Amino acid sequence: MKKLAILGVTVYSFAQLANAATLNVKSYGTTQNGQKVDLYTMSNNNGVSVSFISFGGVITQILTPDAQGKQNNIVLGFDDLKGYEVTDTKEGIHFGGLIGRYANRIGNAKFSLDGKTYNLEKNNGPNSLHSGNPGFDKRVWQVKPLVSKGETVKASLKLTSPNGDQGFPGKLDVEVIYSLSDQNEFKIEYKAKTDQPTVVNLTNHSYFNLSGAGNNPYGVLDHVVQLNAGRILVTDQNSLPTGEIASVAGTPFDFRMPKAIVKDIRANNQQLAYGYGYDQTWVINQKSQGKLNLAAIVVDPKSKRTMQVLTTEPSVQMYTADHLLGNIVGANGVLYRQADALALETQHFPDSPNQPTFPSTRLNPNQTYNSVTVFKFGVQK
């Protein structure tokens, strides 16, 4: 791996590839408390690139070619650091960020572990959502370029969350590895270790629009989605799981066969009404636990772009961004509205610490938290 400095931009060249891939690094500004933030861009040899910043590990841009070879940015975001640090925090939208310590909701913002109750921030009605503020997506991570045989480019992001942070027990050392391959696979690997028993549930909160943000008047409503899931978690009016797991058969949540989002998103259904659209947890049909399983396939009929999502996690939260109310101006001056994007958050079940029948999210000192999610990009033939 060679390191070059060109016009203030650091370029890491990975020479083992026939057409050397690069990881470009440049300054992205400083936070309000004076921390330096850098922008990293990983590129492969097929015209796909992924950009992220050390602030929150936020994915700021994913460029992929459409069926005609035209590149567009397929994730929502902002033009500058202030957008992610100030506007995003105020609105609670988490564009592109790494979510932790516990993604999604924990009921009544508290849980018990080994007989002790831990209280969290109530930031979503009576519940805790994404562990309150500042979450992992509002902190500066330590980033280090890596290289591995067979992968175009790779970077490690590290963060230490001290004991008691966000109300959770134990010091948590987290490493997230972003990598982009010449198979157009953007992989996110999560690892975490603790010094005392705790609970962990990490994810990434990117908002996708395969047409490119602002390029489709229908947002993602015409996107065709297929989910490898036959069940959902039933929620209450605050989008908190009740503990019931229900079949999707005969409901608007049945995406076992490819279906346009628009077909059922406004159906007369109480669960849809609670989320103002799709904001539910689907239970993935796992062939084997701990291995990559297909979670979702998304196709944009306009650009012919496709995205497959594979994960080791037991569930995926599909969120159609129906809380974007047209009051947020994003990158390139685009006004973000309801259903302008689709989030596919791979994760453990929400509120697992309070739901004994759900898979456990407990992490002990002698264990390592491991999770992998892959976003594979392509075009429809």
Swiss-Prot record:
What are the record's GO terms for cellular component? Answer: cytoplasm; periplasmic space
Pathway membership: Carbohydrate metabolism; hexose metabolism
Q: Which Gene3D superfamilies match?
A: 2.70.98.10
Q: What GO molecular functions are on record for this protein?
A: aldose 1-epimerase activity; carbohydrate binding
State the compartments where it is located: Periplasm
Q: Which domain of life is it from?
A: Bacteria
Q: Does the keyword Cell membrane apply?
A: no
Catalytic residues (UniProt): 205 (proton donor), 345 (proton acceptor)
Signal sequence bounds: 1-20
Per the UniProt entry, what are the Gene Ontology biological process annotations, in alphabetical order?
galactose catabolic process via UDP-galactose, Leloir pathway; glucose metabolic process
Recorded E.C. number(s)?
A: 5.1.3.3
Question: Any idea which positions bind substrate?
Answer: 105, 279
**Annotated catalysed reactions:** alpha-D-glucose = beta-D-glucose
For whether the record's keyword set contains Isomerase, the answer is: yes
This protein's UniProt keywords: Carbohydrate metabolism, Isomerase, Periplasm, Signal
Show the Pfam families listed in the entry: Aldose_epim (PF01263)
Q: What does this protein do?
A: Mutarotase converts alpha-aldose to the beta-anomer. Active on D-glucose.
This protein's name: Aldose 1-epimerase
The organism named in the record is: Acinetobacter calcoaceticus
Q: What are the leading ranks of the lineage? A: Bacteria, Pseudomonadati, Pseudomonadota, Gammaproteobacteria, Moraxellales
**Gene that specifies this protein:** mro
